[in-house]
Amino acid sequence: MTKDNYDVASFMEQALVEARAAAERGEVPVGAVLVRDGEVVAKAGNRTLELHDPSAHAELLVIRQACAAAKSQRLPDCDLYVTLEPCTLCATAISFARIRRVYFAADDAKGGAVTNGVRFFDQPTCHHEPEVYSGMCEVEAGELLRSFFAARR
């Protein structure tokens, strides 16, 4: 449960549904769900191949959807649930959007930028540092990624 007594597992499961759908489209299986006041306001999976857009990461897609709906570039009352540790690109967008909390399932030792790599939120140039929680549904998210890449080798 989060501080607001919302069901973290339920939101992370919805992110996993988006990740599985991304895998079925041939995309790297990462899914994200953005939540405000216990309600899902946006959800997406990676679409970089489909949209021919290297920035079409699940996190950016949900941030764009929610900002458009809110008619604001800031989402300070929102929480992000994502199946993989955000990369530097996504961490930057999370910071600029002023997202309150980030929950991620699997660590990304190679491309992650929250607990790995540049640790973007710990940098003095970071505009906003959200609360970060990791490890929810980590095994399932990790296995989804491993099986996706194993099938392509």
Each predicted region: which residue ranges?
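A cytosolic small-molecule/anion-sensing beta-strand core signal
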Residues: 36-37, 64, 76
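A short, polar/charged loop-to-alpha-helix boundary motif
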Residues: 50-60
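Zinc-dependent deaminase
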Residues: 1-22, 73, 86-153
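Short beta->alpha transition motifs characteristic of CBS
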Residues: 41-48
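Immediate flanking context of iron-sulfur cluster ligation sites
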Residues: 72-84
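Small-residue (primarily alanine) positions within well-ordered alpha-helices
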Residues: 15, 19-22, 32, 42, ...
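Short, basic and Ser/Thr-rich N-terminal targeting/leader segments
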Residues: 26-30, 74-76
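Short beta-strand scaffold segments in enzyme catalytic cores
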Residues: 30-38
